[in-house]
């Protein structure tokens, strides 16, 4: 279930489309994505950059790391454990950081 603060359905559908295209999936009221990097160091550097952004947003992911892979789940505990606009915003920021890692 998605709980979007913005009531504009076109804007909500557009955001949903963007996340589908970036391969985020929704499962059990969570946005989920796995990232793969060249090696452990690159994966950990990515996690450090995400941690800074997440802390500034006061919205923190559930994540795991195994060697060069980072698995991330997002939902909003304060909204009852559902996906909200905060999750989409953090996912967008995470994708931006991942693309920066590609370059």
Swiss-Prot record:
Gene3D superfamilies cross-referenced by the UniProt entry: Transcriptional coactivator/pterin dehydratase
Pfam families: Pterin_4a
SUPFAM superfamilies reported in the protein's UniProt record: PCD-like
EC number: 4.2.1.96
Catalytic activity: (4aS,6R)-4a-hydroxy-L-erythro-5,6,7,8-tetrahydrobiopterin = (6R)-L-erythro-6,7-dihydrobiopterin + H2O
Stored InterPro entries: PCD_sf, Pterin_deHydtase
Keyword terms, alphabetized: Lyase
GO-annotated molecular function: 4-alpha-hydroxytetrahydrobiopterin dehydratase activity
GO BP field: tetrahydrobiopterin biosynthetic process
Record-linked HAMAP family: Pterin_4_alpha
Family as reported in the entry's similarity comment: Belongs to the pterin-4-alpha-carbinolamine dehydratase family.
UniProt protein name: Putative pterin-4-alpha-carbinolamine dehydratase
Organism of origin: Cytophaga hutchinsonii (strain ATCC 33406 / DSM 1761 / CIP 103989 / NBRC 15051 / NCIMB 9469 / D465)
